Every structure is written in structure tokens, then in C-alpha cells.
Amino acid sequence: MPILIHLSDLHFGPAYLSHLGETILKEIDAVNPDAVVVSGDFTMRARHNEYRAARDFLEKITRPTLAIPGNHDQPLFAPIERLVNPFGRYREYINRATDSTLSIGGLFIVGLNDNRRILPGGFWSGAQREWLAAQFASAPSGAVKVVATHHQLMWEGKARPAGFWFPSRALAFLARRGVELVLNGHTHVPSAIQSPEGIVVARSGTATSSRTRHGCGNAYNLITIDEKQISVFVRRFDEQSDGFIAAQADAFPRRLNIG
């Protein structure tokens, strides 16, 4: 049974809560998941010191990890660099590739950089869609296909209409490639829903930033996949126990079992 830990919006910088970061590293060691996915916003303002801290954190993760950038990972206070080389610092410190894959433990995960210099809400280029289709065409037989992006594709149970390539089209595109699970972050609010196509869309809260929203607190997702269902467990930090505890659980039938 594949097990994933899904983190997002770590936001190294002034709002980073180091104690929570250390706690998450211990939980990763204890759970020993097949893979860890970090769906963007490693930094607050893409400063070099923030990226160095993010790199140090990633180097402490003992399991295979897939990372993608978020909108905060483009330098805000270096406008020329943001224009001509927005992910240069990300490539220097985190990963030379902003789109990447990870195949392990019955999982085939594709990470897609959906950030643009000025477009809000996420966007996939034509070249990215071609690359994505090629990756899934070569996926190992029987592997669970997963996509990680920073921006959410669904909001309140509906495809979120943002960007120039609408999420409803993105979900249909992914369904045709056999994708069963999409991971994202961005809003700092955890959720898990299933699209009309049967794709589970799981959003992680902010794992380690003090900038939580809507009273959700700090949280990450623990995801398990068996033959029948995909289960998403939100683990939220609890000050009383000084650790992450189970806060919400959702289980969805796998696409191959729908209809």
C-alpha cells in the first residue's frame, strides 16, 4: 500500500516555525512513507538565506522527495531577475528542474511548475502539457499516477476558473492520462475532494508557517492508497500535545472502481 506525505507552503523566512519543521522531520522518519511531495512556496520572498534554510530542510528528509516551486519562490524584490530568470534561485538551491518526476513504491508522480511571472492562479503551457502526456505514457504499468502543482485545480467542489488554461480542462486532460490523485497547496487551507472525473484533489495546509488562514492551523497530509480507495488524512499541529494529530480523514473510491 503506497504511503505519501504531502507538505506545502513551508515559507522559510520570518514566519517559519522551526519547531514544527523539526517535528515534521521526526514524523517522516516514524511513518517511513514511500515518498514525500512538497508542493511549492519553500520561501517567503525567495531570498538566498531562505533558500539555504529550505535546502537544509530537504537534505534532512530521509525518504525520496519530489519538489516543485510556488509563486513565493520567485524573487519579489529583484524585478529584473524575476522577469528574466524567475526560478534561477530555485534551481540553484532546490532542483535544477522545475518540472520533474518520481517513480517509486507503486507511485508515478509528476511535479509541474504552474507559476508564471505575472499570471495569477496557475497556468500550464502547451509544451508542459505535451511533456506531461509523454511522462504518463511511459509510466510503469500498474503505478498510481499522481500530479503535484502549487495552485489548486478545484475550489468548493468545482473546477476553479483561473489562468488562461482552465482547470476544468486540466482535470479532463489528466483523467485521459489515467491520473488518480492531484496534490497542491497555495491557500494554506487543507481539503480533499473528488472531481467529476474521479480524480482525488488534495490540498495541504501550510506545514510550518505562522501565516495560517481561517483558523485551520498548521497541517500537512498523510495519504494512503490501496486497491479500493485513496485516503487523505489531515494532520494538524496541536499545541497541547506538542505534535501533529489526526484532524480529518476522507476516503474516496479509486477511479478504476467508479461506475
Question: How would you describe each model-predicted region?
Answer:
Residues I225-G259:
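A short C-terminal boundary segment appended to hydrolase-like catalytic domains
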